[in-house]
UniProtKB/Swiss-Prot annotation:
Its EC number is 2.7.4.8. Residues 5-184 form the Guanylate kinase-like domain. Keywords: ATP-binding, Cytoplasm, Kinase, Nucleotide-binding, Transferase. One of its GO terms (molecular function) is ATP binding. This is Guanylate kinase.
């Protein structure tokens, strides 16, 4: 049986560029991660594809999955649910493959409670002024929503201590390489590999 894969969790405040960084990681030739697509009740944006960017579901469908215990994590953010379906994640980890989650900060806390040996990475902006500029630059939100997102972002940055690593997204290629380096080093941690060597000794 193969070793269980790593659960890699990337999160950070709205507008920090989580989706852009994640897409750059998965577009690279040496990518070997499995992406767990999040589910949301928010409105589908122009250019987004159901089942590729998110699973877009109604509030009623999402709440039924919560009730059935079918979510690894979920959170309500600016009036919409976001979450991670459980079945795919467990099946993929059991196959020895690394699973990459891009989720909200509230959801990451739930995952850490359930999977404490995951790799938790917090993506940060260079500063809050840059973060606000990125959110405004999307052109998808009204000013009242932008201000609400900024207030939530401040609270989320204060939760950085819950994570294992902080990566500044000043330039996407640099942020991508930092994340890849973190994950590569995690595979060599003694507490992750020692079980294999103990088993080898027992079989000698």
């Amino acid at each position: 049986m193969s070793e269980r894969g790593l659960l890699i969790v990337l999160s950070g405040p709205s507008g920090v560029g989580k989706g852009t960084v994640r897409k750059a990681i998965f577009d690279s030739e040496e990518n070997d991660f499995q992406y767990s697509i999040s589910m949301t009740t928010r409105k589908q944006r122009e250019g987004e594809v159901d089942g590729v960017d998110y699973y877009f579901r109604s509030r009623e469908e999402f709440e039924a999955m919560i009730e059935a215990g079918e979510m690894l994590e979920y959170a309500e953010y600016v009036g919409n649910y976001y979450g991670t379906p459980l079945t795919y994640v467990n099946q993929t980890l059991d196959e020895g493959k690394d699973v990459f989650l891009e989720i909200e900060v509230q959801g990451a806390k739930q995952v850490k409670d359930k999977v404490p040996d995951g790799v938790f990475i917090f993506l940060t902006p260079p500063d809050l002024a840059e973060l606000k500029s990125r959110i405004i630059g999307r052109g998808t939100d009204e000013m009242s929503v932008i201000e609400e997102r900024m207030a939530v972002a401040r609270e989320e940055i204060e939760m950085m201590a819950l994570y294992d690593y902080a990566v500044v997204n000043d330039e996407v290629p640099l942020a991508v390489q930092r994340i890849k380096d973190i994950i590569a080093s995690e595979h060599f941690r003694v507490d992750r590999v020692i079980g294999k060597y103990i088993k080898m000794l027992e079989e000698m």
